[in-house]
Structure formats: C-alpha cells, structure tokens
Amino acid sequence: LVIGVQFLLWTTSGLIFSWNSIESVRGENLIRSQEPLNLRSQEIDDLGELLDSPALAMREDDIVVSALLRTMLDRPVFELTIVRNKKQLVVLVDAVSGKQLSPIDEVMAKRIAQSDFADDAEVRSVEFVESVGSHSEYRGKELPAYRVEMEHTTDTVIYVSANRGAVTTRRNNQWR
C-alpha cells in the first residue's frame, strides 16, 4: 500500500511537470524579440571611432580581459571585462559616446526590464539587491542586481544586472 501511494504521487507529479513547458517555467515565452544590432543606423562615422569608444571609459592601468559589443535599449554598448587594481569587474560603455554606463540606476533597470518583457505591462516595483539568502529565487546569480516586478497575471519578476545592464533571469508563478 505504501509503495502504491508513493508510485501514485510520483506519477501524478511527473504528469504535472510534463504539462508545463520548461520555456513557460523559465519565463522564456514572455521575452520580447529584439532586433539585431545594425551599426549602419548608428551615429558612427567609421569603425575606428567605434573601437576607440571603450578606451574613453578606461583608466591607464586597466587590463581588458574581454570586450563584447551588444545592444542595450537599441543602442550599441561595449560590455568590458577588465582587471582594475587586481580585481576583475565588468564595465558597460556606450559604444558611440564612450561614456561609462555602469552601474546602471533604477530608472535604467526599469527600462531594460520593460523592453525585455513581451507584454506591455507596467512595473509594480523595483528593488536593489546586493545580497541574497540560500533559499532566494535569485541565489547563485550575479550581484548587485535590480529586482523588477511586473504588473502582470504571471507575477513575473525580471532581474537586471547593475554592472552589465542585462537581464540575468526571470521568475514567474510557474517557476515558484
């Protein structure tokens, strides 16, 4: 009888999990599609100007480990991983102006979350997260970050890295 009950519970839970697609659990079905970066549409006169822009935000003794050109809110940005004072950190730089953008502020985090979210939902709340507990829904992820809660039936929460200005993860009712 005990084995039968265990088997019934195991089978039932398996069926429940198989009905929910992993994309819905991860919130991937609520990601807005993004246009690819078109450098011709930006205010860049030549490629040399683009490649010079990260140097404007760097210090003389910085060592570049990696440079990634990507978009943030339809603008080209460089995500630089650098070593500064023997510490590795990420610096976000506007690829056109060379202005350092990181760490981003709450307003920018809100805009990034809204541009990532497929539905036109308002933001319910924004919280700056510097540390999390071992049972947090955001454990093991990049900190500091902004926790942006969307006003939506799925109770979606979008986490945005303060240093990278990028969505790191999404949580919703199905995940919880």
Regions found by a protein language model. Name each.
Residues 1-32:
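Internal alpha-helical transmembrane segments
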Residues 9, 86-88, 100:
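Primarily extracytoplasmic ectodomains and periplasmic/lumenal surface modules that are beta-strand-rich
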Residues 26-72, 103-137:
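Short, non-transmembrane alpha-helical segments in secretory-pathway proteins
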Residues 57-91, 129-158:
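Exposed beta-strand-loop-beta-strand "reactive/processing" segments of non-cytosolic proteins
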Residues 95-122, 143-176:
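Extended, hydrophilic extramembrane loops/domains of integral membrane proteins
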